[in-house]
Curated annotation (Swiss-Prot):
Classification via SMART domains: NDK
Family (UniProt): Belongs to the NDK family.
Active site (catalytic residues): 129 (pros-phosphohistidine intermediate)
GO biological process: CTP biosynthetic process; GTP biosynthetic process; negative regulation of cell growth; negative regulation of mitotic nuclear division; UTP biosynthetic process
Protein name: Nucleoside diphosphate kinase 6
Reactions it catalyzes: a 2'-deoxyribonucleoside 5'-diphosphate + ATP = a 2'-deoxyribonucleoside 5'-triphosphate + ADP; a ribonucleoside 5'-diphosphate + ATP = a ribonucleoside 5'-triphosphate + ADP
Protein species of origin: Mus musculus (Mouse)
Main enzyme class: transferase
Cross-referenced SUPFAM superfamilies: Nucleoside diphosphate kinase, NDK (SSF54919)
GO cellular component, one term: mitochondrial inner membrane
Matching PANTHER family: NUCLEOSIDE DIPHOSPHATE KINASE 6
Length: 189
């Protein structure tokens, strides 16, 4: 794996997944989307997809053999999911805090305003997934966005998004660097 050079103040990327339980309910999906925006994440890329069984098994292979593995794989392939590449100064930790604890009972007790605390149903149907490290974020982003070049993003788009101005395009569902006068620059893969 190639090393990606980042400036010390560079934005960090993370993968955020919205699970089938939330995507199936438009009001819940919109509530999660609004939480992403209100917490000042930049949405770099987004896509909605129906996950293939073999891709899901590969993604969760570290959990193979655990008691919840089969249930998790079946659930994650049961309906559409939404994948985001999010950027923020400390995107991984901020997204994990916003999600709340994996276990919904615990989330309701210690982080009731978190996504999982307020919207999660069970430990599997807990609304969201997020990368837990820079290494896993890179791996997970590549799994869902194979045409996305993290290196090229850090070289070309990150400085523009970090230094602003930034425009959110509701039609595209992503943030783009805006030129003076409000015209946005094309967002390249």
């Amino acid at each position: 794996m190639t090393s990606i050079l980042r400036s010390p103040q560079a934005l960090q990327l993370t993968l955020a997944l919205i699970k089938p339980d939330a995507v199936a309910h438009p009001l819940i999906l919109e509530a999660v989307h609004q939480q992403i925006l209100s917490n000042k994440f930049l949405i770099v890329r987004t896509r909605e997809l129906q996950w293939k069984l073999e891709d899901c098994r590969r993604f969760y292979r570290e959990h193979e053999g655990r008691f919840f593995y089969q249930r998790l794989v079946e659930f994650m392939t049961s309906g559409p999911i939404r994948a985001y590449i999010l950027a923020h100064k400390d995107a991984i930790q901020l997204w994990r805090t916003l999600m709340g604890p994996t276990r919904v009972f615990r989330a309701r007790y210690i982080a009731p305003d978190s996504i999982r605390g307020s919207l999660g149903l069970t430990d599997t149907r807990n609304t969201t997934h997020g990368s837990d490290s820079v290494v896993s974020a890179s791996r997970e982003i590549a799994a869902f966005f194979p045409d996305f070049s993290e290196q090229r993003w850090y070289e070309e788009e990150e400085p523009q998004l970090r230094c602003g101005p930034v425009h959110y395009s509701p039609e595209e569902g992503i943030h783009c660097a805006a030129e003076t006068g409000g015209h946005k620059q094309p967002n390249k893969t």
